[in-house]
Amino acid sequence: MFIIIKHGDNQEFLVNSNCSVLLLLHYIRKKMKLRKTDTIDLCDESGTMKLLFLSKTPGDSASKFLTARNTYYVCKVERGAPGTRIENSYKAIVPMLKNPEPELVDSLRTQCDFLERSRIKMLRTLEAKRLAAMESSVNLPARSPKGGGAQQTTSTSSQLKSKGGRSDEDGPPSTRRPFYKTRADFLKRHR
């Protein structure tokens, strides 16, 4: 289950894809002397990205996403500047090749635009849900009595009655305890 990774000036190396996505990306970064914080991905020869960097479960086997004996290019995913409002935006996806084909660059640019539009759409959806939740909690309708509030003829003594049928005038309700806390309590009471 090997794949060919091409980069730079027509350089290539073999990678065993029978490992986790996390380990595969780590190995490629190390082999190409990239920083650990660099976001990279692989694309096939037609420019279709594999989106390994977006994997929800990086422990999954990379062979699920990659075809054995195929050639893949390393691409660097450029995001917004850290600490800014556009920190998570997709700025560009750049193939790590000296002279990439124009079709490859166009395909990656199209996919980058699509990723950014999807990210913005998701943010707008989340913001709309958050606003709807806030509005519904702020604008809760006040409950009014069924009779309209004008006809309230309950006596004060019936208002003082609790669920047990006792009135508050009888004193505080007795504390209710479980019959038996432990097996020892049960045996004490029945001997």
Curated annotation (Swiss-Prot):
Residues 151-162 have a biased composition (Low complexity). Residues 137-191 are annotated as: Disordered. One of its GO terms (biological process) is transcription by RNA polymerase II. InterPro entries: CXorf65-like (IPR039471). Residues 182-191 have a biased composition (Basic and acidic residues). GO terms for molecular function: RNA polymerase II cis-regulatory region sequence-specific DNA binding. It holds the Pfam family Il2rg. It comes from the Eukaryota. PANTHER family: AB2-183 (PTHR33887:SF4), PB1 DOMAIN-CONTAINING PROTEIN (PTHR33887). This is Uncharacterized protein CXorf65 homolog. The gene is Gm614.
